[in-house]
Regions:
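Alpha/beta-hydrolase active-site loop
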Residues: 109-131
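Conserved alpha/beta-hydrolase
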Residues: 87-106
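Hydrolase active-site cap/lid region
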Residues: 149-206
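Short beta-strand/loop motif that positions the catalytic acidic residue
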Residues: 204-205, 210-212, 216
């Protein structure tokens, strides 16, 4: 890992203020503790003293490839009870992780926690795989805000991860906060100081798949293009879903989305 690109909690001081956080995180508690679909199990992974993160594991097969997935800022893991079967049907095990304050997780969501917690989550996820004798290869995936923790893990553990998948990801935190209408005077120079995602992409050389909606107005397609162009991966692919926006990308592009995902995981698993 390139130490020059590593972030410390002090780096997030400008971001982790209530007047900024309220524009970014929308925590919601899980009203359904038990999964609504077969072959799904809830897990709690400790990430800090007194704080555990809720995850939901959807099993296709013990030998299938495994995706550790970070969702968007308005979602919780149990929402994927309706989507995960599409992943398992193409032969992929999916583990969806929450953030602090989301689902059944403890704590309060912050930028610092969002970037720190993926490391113990990754260790906990690997423990789940070992304990259950799930032998497939490991991938990381992030949607929207979740692109940041996914890229953090891909950047940090390339020798353990077979591939990175980004859906509707953002290139830099400054541009993201602009799009979320965070008042500029509350951020100072943070736009230049913390680029979050794009700064790590040249150092990530594992296979990378980027999926983005053509008409995404929340995180415009240019973010996906920038991440793709900045990637240091020898194998990389940008899939643009025609006619799709931020929140209907899976529905509109389901066939192309799942086909690309299956091809990517199979080809690099």
């Amino acid at each position: 890992m390139n130490e020059e690109l590593a972030h410390s909690e002090e780096d997030f001081a400008l971001l982790d203020r209530p007047e900024v956080l309220r524009f970014v995180f929308y925590p919601r508690k899980d009203m359904f503790a038990r999964p609504m679909v077969e072959n799904a199990t809830p897990h709690m992974i400790p990430v800090d003293e007194g704080v555990s993160i809720s995850c939901r594991f959807y099993l296709a097969d013990k030998k299938a490839s495994n995706i550790l997935y970070f969702h968007g800022n308005g979602e919780i893991a149990s929402d994927y009870d309706h989507i995960a079967p599409a992943f398992t049907q193409i032969g992929v095990n999916l583990c969806v992780a929450d953030y602090r304050g989301y689902g059944s997780s403890g704590g309060t969501p912050t930028f610092a926690a969002m970037m720190k917690d993926p490391h113990p989550l990754f260790d906990g996820f690997k423990s789940i795989l070992r304990q259950n004798k799930y032998s497939g290869r490991l991938f990381v995936m992030g949607r929207s805000l979740g692109s940041a923790p996914a890229i953090e893990l891909a950047f940090s553990y390339q020798e353990q991860i077979r591939g990175l998948i980004i859906e509707s990801g953002f290139a830099s935190v400054g541009r993201l906060l602009d799009l979320l209408s965070v008042p500029a005077e509350r951020l100072g120079s943070v736009r230049e100081e913390l680029s979050f995602n794009i700064d790590r992409m040249p150092a990530i050389t594992i296979p990378t798949l980027i999926i983005h909606g053509e008409y995404d107005s929340l995180i415009p397609l240019q973010h996906g293009i920038d991440l793709y162009q900045g990637s240091g991966a020898r194998y990389k692919r940008l899939l643009v879903i025609p006619g799709a926006t931020h929140n209907d990308i899976f529905l509109i592009g389901m066939e192309a989305y799942l086909s690309a995902l299956k091809e990517f995981v199979t080809g690099h698993g």
